[in-house]
Amino acid sequence: TIGKGYGYQVAKKVYDSKLSDDKIDQIDNILENLILDPTNRRLLINLFNIDDLSEMNLAPCAYETFFMVEYLEDNYGIVRPKLNVVLNQRSGDFIVAAHPGGWNEFQYYFLYRLIADLIGFELGTFIHNTYNLHLYNRHIDIVDNILEVEEVDMYHFIKAPFETKEEIRKEINNT
């Protein structure tokens, strides 16, 4: 097991709830603050707890997630909150976890989507910083195989925002 890393740090009840007399974990703290004080500059989850490092089998690689809310006016003049996230990762194995669309990015993007949906905010920008992205020698053959595969258009992104319903229908019919 990873010991006192990742899930243990997230689930540790260290914050005083603003809604009850209970202690809450890092996720509940983010949710509470997004509801009560969405412009708070302390909306972060930090897994790098120096006091517990000796009891972690691996120091957290993806160690910090910072949430920011911005209020933007849409094409209809309605101001809507958008949730932005920055994921900071100290170290990342390219093949296993840290490549674009990899395991780490997927996990944190899923968390981002879940929190935005729970609070009712639109998605803004998701940024993933990896400070030491590396490829191990044992994975070079895998990378060679990946590079030989022809490019496949796996995703189709719908442009937004649209000016008219007709543009939306046209784009949907083109997918």
Predicted feature locations:
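Terminal, non-catalytic protein-protein interaction segments that mediate quaternary/complex assembly
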Residues: 1-175
